[in-house]
Regions:
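A short beta-strand-loop structural module common to alpha/beta enzyme folds
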Residues: 23-35
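Glycine-rich phosphate/diphosphate-binding loop of Rossmann-like nucleotide-binding domains
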Residues: 1-20
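Helix-adjacent hinge/juxtasegments
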Residues: 43-80
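Short, structured coil segments at secondary-structure junctions
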Residues: 20, 73-74, 94
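Helix-loop module immediately N-terminal to the HCX5R catalytic loop
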Residues: 34-45
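C-terminal binding/interaction regions
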Residues: 2-8, 84-147
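Short amphipathic alpha-helical segments
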Residues: 12-15, 68-72, 112-113
Length: 147
């Protein structure tokens, strides 16, 4: 779980995850150190990509910056989710593995509902497997070109 700035919503989400029994790796401001949003997102995304953690949550003012930055890490499918249904869909239809939340428009209780939906949705819709694989091929194609 990472954020660029200390914010009650980000802290509430980390605390909520711990209350649910999850081990939370606190990155960036969630860990007590204000961190530029690209670095906070990278720290969380690398942990997910390395499979050191099961999933990640990243936050910044709009959620857009951290989602863009996290998606630069190979193997990451970060989704900016504004409600529980978006979170469910991101997991079910896109196999998203990093949740991005905007702090400017998401209060603590709403963020907790989004996180709950994210965690409760574990199974990817099998009819989307081919599309998810297409995204993986796109990533491989463009990652190879940039080396």
């Amino acid at each position: 779980m990472g954020s660029d700035t200390r914010h009650e919503t980000a802290t509430a989400v980390a605390d909520h995850l711990e209350r649910l029994g999850h081990t939370v790796v606190r990155c960036g401001a969630v860990g007590g150190v204000d961190t530029p949003w690209p670095e906070a997102a990278d720290e969380v995304a690398r942990l997910v990509a390395q499979r050191a953690v099961d999933t990640g949550v990243v936050c910044c003012w709009t959620g857009t910056g951290v989602s863009i930055a996290a998606n630069k890490v190979p193997g990451i499918r970060a989704a900016l989710c504004i409600d529980a249904e978006t979170a469910r869909g991101a997991r079910r239809w896109n196999d998203a593995n990093v949740l991005a939340i905007g702090l400017s428009n998401t209060d603590a209780r709403s963020a907790e509902r989004i996180v709950d939906a994210w965690l409760e949705t574990r199974d990817v819709d099998p009819t989307e497997a081919e599309n998810i694989e297409r995204v993986a091929r796109l990533e491989q194609r463009y990652t190879r070109r940039q080396r």
